[in-house]
Amino acid sequence: MSKIIGIDLGTTNSAVAVLEGGEAKIIANPEGNRTTPSVVSFKNGEIQVGEVAKRQAVTNPNTISSIKRHMGEAGYKVDVEGKSYTPQEVSAMILQYLKGFAEDYLGEKVEKAVITVPAYFNDAQRQATKDAGKIAGLEVERIVNEPTAAALAYGLDKTDKDEKILVFDLGGGTFDVSILELGDGVFDVLSTAGDNNLGGDDFDNKIIDYMVAEFKKENGIDLANDKMALQRLKDAAEKAKKDLSGVTSTQISLPFITAGEAGPLHLEMNLTRAKFDELTSDLVERTKVPVRQALKDAGLNPSEIDEVILVGGSTRIPAVVEAVRKETNKEPNKSVNPDEVVAMGAAIQGGVITGDVKDVVLLDVTPLSLGIETMGGVFTKLIDRNTTIPTSKSQVFSTAADNQPAVDIHVLQGERPMAADNKTLGRFQLTDIPAAPRGVPQIEVSFDIDKNGIVNVRAKDLGTQKEQTITIKSSSGLSDDEIERMVKDAEANAEADKQRKEEVDLRNDADALLFTVDKTLKELEGKVDAEEVKKAEDARDELKAAIEANDIEQMKAKRDSLNEIVQNLTVKLYEQAAQQQAQENPEAAQGGADDVVDADFEEVNGDDK
């Protein structure tokens, strides 16, 4: 069975891992880094992903970051260079890049992946992630919750222990808390809670707002209206946040940030950890609520938790670590790398699927309650949150009016009592209900949640046995035709990227050859026929013309032709050198027979030694 890679598709950074020799191994990107910025940039039709895209964010307005925050969002698109892209398509570009360098590392084609999502992602967001994988040319074998994947990586070598662990996962854009019970190779999720709009980006934004306010106070200029300045502020804020995890004070220096009437202006500021903690105290406070909720849902006290695992780069913030310490009365476990552990867990789950990892069972839960809208706009739950998946549940409903010919099934996800306050997953209709007084028809509504947390709903008239089934497609969901088109676009982009690389390699080859030719012709001056030199010079000029005309086919032909001429000239040069040496030293040319000593070799046996 082919390898299944594990992908942590993050808000700010992504990572890819694979199972080798029973152990999960992170695959480094072409720059040698173990995580890749989840950034995509567009320039003159060329798509770039990762480090190179992030580096040009200041100067290139067509750079997209943190697209994960918009996954599953109805109608959301980004317009770049005259084209519109859905969050699924942008995410697919990141996945395609990760897939590409994973293939280079493995030396084989990769077609299957396990992709992680925040535990608190709803159905629409999970479906969008699966679609992104499909567009990138990946068969998504499983969608795994990030904290669960982290627990899998942490606990794989501890299957003989019985432990209750709390995973605190604060990433770039999302926050999850999951509580799991580990024992005999079973990873049983007891509860999960979270906030899909809380992450490292929010901590950065607090620093940005502070810098903008201070600069305005000093200079009367609002940097919030200057796109290029804002991007520089974002980079500086991220760096300052990271610095303050290790030191208590950091200097922010941004020369020529903007210009005033008197000339250029610079931003110079000292930010202390105490000030940073003050600016972000409300965010740290927000992390405590899901911790308490998860403990309550699991029916546990903090004292019953054996280990606290920190996941996500934002858990390096000292105030966050302190908050976790206080809430759980535990020293967080530092044995896992918060940036890599999720991708490693995904790779392990891939190994479970292929059978390479044995005696491990993963029991995950649905993060939000599921149900339908009933009379009076009430949300009637069929499946409660934190129910182990896969699962299914049925309930019988009836009509609200006499002779009602059809019922509308409005499927929702959430925790609020009224339907309007919850997230709509989809709507469908069961028609041709025979005329009968209200309350007589028996309509059975069944919910089915698969192992990826994706929902199927069925409505059946028990009188006529007529039924209607729907796989939930949210308002942001893509049709099969749309996905097919996007897959073709993604393949075309990959082909275009490959062609572009070949063109660059060809141009580099040609440039190197021109340099070699000039050097060789200089060495051959006066040593070979002028006609031979002229032939080489003509071929060189023809190659230069092909490069200037950007004619790929001509470039290939002229390069090969010039290469042949240069090789012939080089051979002649060596022949001449050999002749010259022979003339200068005739004895050496004759083989120098007198200087050669004949040697007799005799085999020595152990006895003769």
Curated annotation (Swiss-Prot):
SUPFAM superfamilies: Actin-like ATPase domain (SSF53067), Heat shock protein 70kD (HSP70), C-terminal subdomain (SSF100934), Heat shock protein 70kD (HSP70), peptide-binding domain (SSF100920). GO terms for molecular function: ATP binding; ATP-dependent protein folding chaperone; unfolded protein binding. Residues 577-594 have a biased composition (Low complexity). Induction: By stress conditions e.g. heat shock. InterPro entries: ATPase_NBD, Chaperone_DnaK, Heat_shock_70_CS, HSP70_C_sf, HSP70_peptide-bd_sf, Hsp_70_fam. The keyword ATP-binding applies. CDD domains: ASKHA_NBD_HSP70_DnaK-like (cd10234). PROSITE patterns: HSP70_1, HSP70_2, HSP70_3. It comes from the Bacteria. Pfam families: HSP70. Keywords: ATP-binding, Chaperone, Nucleotide-binding, Phosphoprotein, Stress response. The modification Phosphothreonine is found at residue 174. Residues 595-609 have a biased composition (Acidic residues). This is Chaperone protein DnaK.
